[in-house]
């Protein structure tokens, strides 16, 4: 049995499989007699924050740290090294935020209260999207994975800006100032060629606390820290960035992401009817994610390539881009977070309807995106 387990964890797709299993277990528990226990656990407080809060703002900051490390490495010496390939995911991300929001607005023009949820389908759940992609293992070109990483990070940063400007009423200026100072200090350490990881982790922790207290999504601190870690060590030293990336990967893939999925996928379907699913609010969210996302990402990507503004990453074609654009319709936790900000304290019924739309759109995006990606990729890695 131990050999079976060891062989499983060696699989490229193992992390994605664990994430899907964890999400499925959460859904089953949330719709069983164990639901109250599940809810009580997630809302139990440890050190002033709920378990759910620790997972989403604490553990996921480590995940975003790894993402920051991977994207920085690709920008400096990998698939995003040229200007044309680096700008490509940024252009795609803009389309991926605009089109879903417009689809949602088109469905809810007649309801001013529902319109406040316009940003719900603009988000991409990077963890779930990567988890589904990971199911295909080493068939996925590194350059395509990096495109998804970069696109989703820019998308998430855009959502953070949206939250700050449209959904946050109590930003802490002092905490933001401290956060900016810590960010400056991190890049000063980099500029001075400091390669000892512990100094970056110390400043990064203070940055995380300040961002957490500021009212902005704390996972942003992880991305900033990842970009500050130096790629090259001093003479004779190993790469700090690559060392940290290698060390974090198994913890993120086999612990943090499955825990995240378990904590966020438990959506109750109690009281759900066909009539409630076909009202404009959940339809706007679901179609914004499932149709708006690929429409925006693919059309902006296509125009960017055809106009010569950007170019496709090595080993990637437009079929791959379309499959990834569908996969980006997995809004899930980021969309749920925005829904809670838009409706949670004002209209709980709207919040529930939005979550149903998120579940529908994200599920369709995951299934269809996986199928399209599987069809478009070679059967075996080259």
Swiss-Prot record:
Domain of life where this protein originates: Bacteria
Main location: membrane
Summary of the function given for this chain in its UniProt record: Na(+)/H(+) antiporter that extrudes sodium in exchange for external protons.
Family indicated by similarity: Belongs to the NhaA Na(+)/H(+) (TC 2.A.33) antiporter family.
Pfam families in the record: Na_H_antiport_1 (PF06965)
Location in or out of the cell: Cell inner membrane
TM region(s), chain numbering: 14-34, 49-69, 87-107, 117-137, 146-166, 171-191, 205-225, 252-272, 285-305, 321-341, 356-376
GO cellular component terms given for this protein: plasma membrane
Disulfide bonds: none
NCBIfam families per UniProt: NhaA, PRK09560.1, PRK09561.1
Protein name from the UniProt record: Na(+)/H(+) antiporter NhaA
GO biological-process terms attached to the record: regulation of pH
PANTHER family linked to this entry: NA(+)_H(+) ANTIPORTER NHAA, SODIUM ION/PROTON ANTIPORTER NHAA-RELATED
Membrane topology reported for the UniProt record: Multi-pass membrane protein
Molecular-function annotations in GO: sodium:proton antiporter activity
Catalytic activity: Na(+)(in) + 2 H(+)(out) = Na(+)(out) + 2 H(+)(in)
Keyword field: Antiport, Cell inner membrane, Cell membrane, Ion transport, Membrane, Sodium, Sodium transport, Transmembrane, Transmembrane helix, Transport
UniProt gene name: nhaA
